Amino acid sequence: MSVHAPAPFAPSAPLRLFNSLTRQLEAFQPVHAGEARVYSCGPTVYNYPHIGNMRAYVFADLLGRTLSFKGLKLTHVINITDVGHLTDDADEGEDKMEKMARAEARSIWDIAKHYTQAYWEDVKALNIRQPARWTIATEYVPQMIAFAERIAAKHCYELDSGLYFDVSTVADYGRLARAQTEEGEGRIEAVEGKRNGADFAIWRKTPPGEKRQMEWDSPWGRGAPGWHLECSVMSGEVLGFPFDIHTGGIDHREIHHPNEIAQNQAFCCTNGLDVPANSGARIWMHNNFLVERSGKMSKSSGEFLRLQLLIDKGYHPLAYRLMCLQAHYRSELEFSWEGLGAALTRLKRMLIAVGQLKERAPEVAAQPGPRFTPFLERFDAAMSDDLNTAVALTVFEEVLGLKKVDPADKLAAVAAMDAVLGLGLLELDRRALRIRPKGVEIDEAGIEALLDARKAARAEKDFARSDALRDQIAAKGVEVMDGDPLGWEWKLA
């Protein structure tokens, strides 16, 4: 009698995603059969990313992992903006890169390199997969000039300050945000000579007598590309128009993405009409803000939470990833240290369960057995329902809690789900969660020495000394865990 291996699980639930452009859930129909092409607005590398910024990239990573889980060949592009992003997000203020370079007395190129590396370190810490391509804005300036030349005659006009896009030349401008195009609406400050309040610069001229650190020759004079032009060009160059999905934070829904769409309409058709077909991407997706009790997180106040601060306090970055997954991406997520602590506790429970499972199943089965098919189907249904991670996590924890099942099959099911959630539980060690808080005087060797002394005291039945040592250890910010193989953990504030 031959023994047949279980058939591979094939996710079959229809994938439905919320399209900000149409304001409804839509079935995902790839532009190219069997493929998914995704562009995500990346950081402007003038400062460290805060954890609210990083929520956008956890969301984009989750989307990409889900598309891969659904059997699609994923091409994911994330840009790095190293020029052209003004402090006002529209057409007022100065370039954020130039402002930081002046503040830190460094070149813009040094600023870009430093903060790009800092961003990539956070990407790695949060177990965000590398995209197929990082596109760096300054590497695409010739293509940006060519794009602007193609649309300039019918859709742009020139002022002393730059080349501006006339939003009245495309159909239904601002559909994404229902933005107003009239002057005085308060959405965008006026620039002298603009035809419409919402018109925006696609090329900013260097003022006479000035020299910027980043500037290029163009048909409209020496200058630099506008922020909105950059994303239109990089997404179209790498993915081609139309592509499947464009992601970004909800703040992009107001100005940046409507302007991208307007440019794409102008580029993709002769009359600027037909928003759904010519918006560049078929589906536009936006994650909501991370908020504190004082309001949404931003860098403008000069006070914001970096991922490194969480680590300095002893929290593993994947606890923050789990915190993000506990809320739907379109919902506001309130950050609190209590909430982060609860996510860390939940992550520890998961890791303990996976660790115990790995002891029973040294190898992962090639495929989960049929016992796990209903769970995988529920997990698939949750993720296919506009990335319902809260339900998916519940199903995942149900699987972790199953008893009297084949451990190798169970580990295969856990691995399949975690490949989507991205918590890295099969590779993570419990000791990795034990991060020493910054400023704590004692190190791990010192703790182990005290624990050895306490162990000796208990062996000698010197319970008074044992209790005194436990108190001494606790006073140093350490929790002793008798009976747990890990032995101890840091107490986190």
UniProtKB/Swiss-Prot annotation:
<protein>
    <recommendedName>
        <fullName>Cysteine--tRNA ligase</fullName>
        <ecNumber>6.1.1.16</ecNumber>
    </recommendedName>
</protein>
<keyword id="KW-0963">Cytoplasm</keyword>
<feature type="binding site">
    <location>
        <position position="260"/>
    </location>
    <ligand>
        <name>Zn(2+)</name>
    </ligand>
</feature>
<keyword id="KW-0030">Aminoacyl-tRNA synthetase</keyword>
<dbReference type="InterPro" id="IPR032678">
    <property type="entry name" value="tRNA-synt_1_cat_dom"/>
</dbReference>
<dbReference type="GO" id="GO:0004817">
    <property type="term" value="F:cysteine-tRNA ligase activity"/>
</dbReference>
<dbReference type="GO" id="GO:0008270">
    <property type="term" value="F:zinc ion binding"/>
</dbReference>
<dbReference type="GO" id="GO:0005829">
    <property type="term" value="C:cytosol"/>
</dbReference>
<feature type="short sequence motif" description="'HIGH' region">
    <location>
        <begin position="43"/>
        <end position="53"/>
    </location>
</feature>
<keyword id="KW-0547">Nucleotide-binding</keyword>
<feature type="binding site">
    <location>
        <position position="299"/>
    </location>
    <ligand>
        <name>ATP</name>
    </ligand>
</feature>
<dbReference type="GO" id="GO:0006423">
    <property type="term" value="P:cysteinyl-tRNA aminoacylation"/>
</dbReference>
<dbReference type="GO" id="GO:0005524">
    <property type="term" value="F:ATP binding"/>
</dbReference>
<dbReference type="InterPro" id="IPR024909">
    <property type="entry name" value="Cys-tRNA/MSH_ligase"/>
</dbReference>
<dbReference type="InterPro" id="IPR056411">
    <property type="entry name" value="CysS_C"/>
</dbReference>
<dbReference type="InterPro" id="IPR014729">
    <property type="entry name" value="Rossmann-like_a/b/a_fold"/>
</dbReference>
<dbReference type="Pfam" id="PF01406">
    <property type="entry name" value="tRNA-synt_1e"/>
</dbReference>
<keyword id="KW-0648">Protein biosynthesis</keyword>
<keyword id="KW-0862">Zinc</keyword>
<dbReference type="Pfam" id="PF23493">
    <property type="entry name" value="CysS_C"/>
</dbReference>
<comment type="subunit">
    <text>Monomer.</text>
</comment>
<feature type="short sequence motif" description="'KMSKS' region">
    <location>
        <begin position="296"/>
        <end position="300"/>
    </location>
</feature>
<dbReference type="InterPro" id="IPR009080">
    <property type="entry name" value="tRNAsynth_Ia_anticodon-bd"/>
</dbReference>
<keyword id="KW-0479">Metal-binding</keyword>
<keyword id="KW-0436">Ligase</keyword>
<feature type="binding site">
    <location>
        <position position="256"/>
    </location>
    <ligand>
        <name>Zn(2+)</name>
    </ligand>
</feature>
<feature type="binding site">
    <location>
        <position position="231"/>
    </location>
    <ligand>
        <name>Zn(2+)</name>
    </ligand>
</feature>
<feature type="binding site">
    <location>
        <position position="41"/>
    </location>
    <ligand>
        <name>Zn(2+)</name>
    </ligand>
</feature>
<comment type="similarity">
    <text>Belongs to the class-I aminoacyl-tRNA synthetase family.</text>
</comment>
<keyword id="KW-0067">ATP-binding</keyword>
<dbReference type="InterPro" id="IPR015273">
    <property type="entry name" value="Cys-tRNA-synt_Ia_DALR"/>
</dbReference>
<dbReference type="InterPro" id="IPR015803">
    <property type="entry name" value="Cys-tRNA-ligase"/>
</dbReference>
